[in-house]
Amino acid sequence: MLTIQKFGGSSLADVEKLHRAAQLCVRERERGRDVVMVVSAMGGATDELLALAYSVSAAPGERELDALMSTGECASAALCAIALEAQGQRAISLAGWQSGIFTDTEHGEARIQTLTAGRIRSALAHGIVPVVSGFQGIDRYGDVTTLGRGGSDTTAVALAAALRAEGCDIYTDVAGIYTADPRLVPSARLLDAADTRDMLRLSYAGAQVLHAVSLETALEKGVELRLRSSDGVGEGTLVRLLGEGERPPLAGLALSRGRITLVGREAGSALAEMRACLAARGIECLGGAEGKENAFVEVARGDAQRALGALHAHFFAEAK
């Protein structure tokens, strides 16, 4: 059995967290599973590299910017491989180009076109854990490209599909996926399972947990994801294509600036109820619309968090 483990920047922010990520990998290996790790740049590293580039030039070239930005993930991969070796697990760090990740030529927003993964397969065959630099690949000219925001998630999903992995675990600093951002709505509920289509709509609406391109890839390739905490506690949230009998009527709420979007198979007819909920609490609704399986309202930014909390209490109360 093969598992893809993807670790975000906040899960690799310091030496202690690097070792914790390595421990999670070793634990899977002790259960008899092969593992491919995919890593983001350490927390803050990408912003530091970007600031450095713009301190040198007000308009750095796209090619060189990609070459620079990709080094953050490469550093993380090397450090994770070192941490694994320190725990007795053989490992090898691989940049995107070494992993056989071929993209188009759109620097900064490249899309994966083919994935050969020859060196990854070879490492796995020899009991070695490949630690792959996420967020990057190589184009037909041999130039390094980056995949844009959320690119490491996309790398993990693409590898899961190409290698036919049994699982793709996305480790973050939260316990899983909630009915709303728990930082804004403390009463938000952790979901055991979520539908890939619903998560994609929430991502389009501004939810920050999983990026849209990775979810599009998961939907296209039939990859199941599990979003879980990097502290290793709990089972997190399984994201897959749910049957109609399994799908909840409402999946969650997303906030982007002053727009609050409700997503779910019954959300498309909820606009009037959303407006009424806000009106009952004295919150002015500035606009809104309904879609097939979503509806949104617009409020003043100063009212946004209070409106989000009110809508969550209305639609996701325990009695509902």
Where are these regions (language model features)?
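A conserved regulatory-domain signal marking ACT and ACT-like small-molecule sensing domains
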Residues: 236-320
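Glycine-rich beta-alpha junction loops
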Residues: 42, 174-176, 221, 229-234, ...
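Nucleotide/pyrophosphate-binding catalytic subdomain
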Residues: 1-215, 288-291, 295-303
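A conserved active-site cap/scaffold subdomain adjacent to cofactor or substrate pockets
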Residues: 202-240
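Conserved NTP-handling cores and scaffolds of large molecular machines
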Residues: 163, 206, 222, 282, ...
